Amino acid sequence: MFSNNNFIKATEQYNTFEKNVPAYYFRRTFHSDHSAIAKITIAVCGFYEIYFNGKNITKGFLSPYISNTNDYIYYDEYEVLLDVGENVFGILLGNGLQNNPGGHIWDFDKASFRSAPMFSLYVTQGENVLLCSDENFKVKPSPIQSDDYRFGEVYNANYELDGWCQKDFDDSSWESALPAIAPNGELRSA
């Protein structure tokens, strides 16, 4: 059921030494008529944190496994209990090695797998797909104005948005996510 057909991103931009691409917030609300356990499957090109109804549910740090996404794209799975009524998914998506400016030593700026950070997410209950990543996700730059695997991050607290992954947050001024061309790699469980 999970496929790499539904990748989305926040921007077309690439990180360079002259211009950094911030990590982006992504959020999406949806309605559930009943409380039930659902499975989230997420494949990411970049590093991410995932939030459900305001709670960080990410497994570990620097998720997912690092890979050449022309070969493999690792995905993670989570189980959550849906609330009756509104539910919200939040994702903080950083560059990881996917959008690394590289340099003279590592040449990541010339890597064939290079792209703006992107992800594909499916929420399922048994065989039923409840939600998948699409342009209905809303995006906004996060306080992480620059993140690089080797050079660290620049954090600007002026961009903090309290409650951005909570149910009652107003995201009406946020932009819509963009569709992304999926990498060629084979999907593998992390």
Question: Which functions belong to the PLM regions below?
Answer:
Residues M1-T29, R188-A190:
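Non-catalytic, glycine-rich low-complexity segments
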Residues T11, I42, L178:
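Pocket-edge structural micro-motifs
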Residues N15-T16, V21, F26-E160:
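Accessory beta-strand-rich segments of carbohydrate-active enzymes
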Residues N158, D162, A177-A180:
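Extended, acidic-biased charged interface segments
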Residues C165:
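An acidic-aromatic substrate-binding cleft motif
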Residues L178-A190:
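Edge strands and adjacent loops of beta-rich recognition modules
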